[in-house]
């Protein structure tokens, strides 16, 4: 384990030790040997949200998307109340309690999370480019609100089945995230409620 890996794992442990919250994975135990630190986390046999969506052809009901979005938002609100920016929100870090449609979701993988005081800002790079806020991509200072941008990206994916700014070229993703609006003219937009349209466009 490199020093960087150890630092990320220690950061994750400190954050996981803080809370017990329904939509955040629980840390059950910690043990180590001479070379490895082990975390025992609760079992979530449904896999991650990306696989859940992929198994359904990235096509789920709006009502199901609403439940997932609300669960993610309440988890982020809880983290932010403790001054913690999650900083790596993406479907691969959202675990499912089962493979069924009514599965509960829990945030996992807090290695990139960071405590940011109310009047503090950070310019530390992080995360996955398709889900990161423009200020992060530009190397500018940011606060905990960058998680809300990532929530918007995940919400867009849940209702549309696609990412709002997606390309094999990372430079183009950056350019589109900064300069372009997502596609609101595709057929999927006509299939969701007025409230859903309003939320996604925010």
PLM regions: where:
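Activation segment signature within eukaryotic-like protein kinase domains
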Residues: 68-69
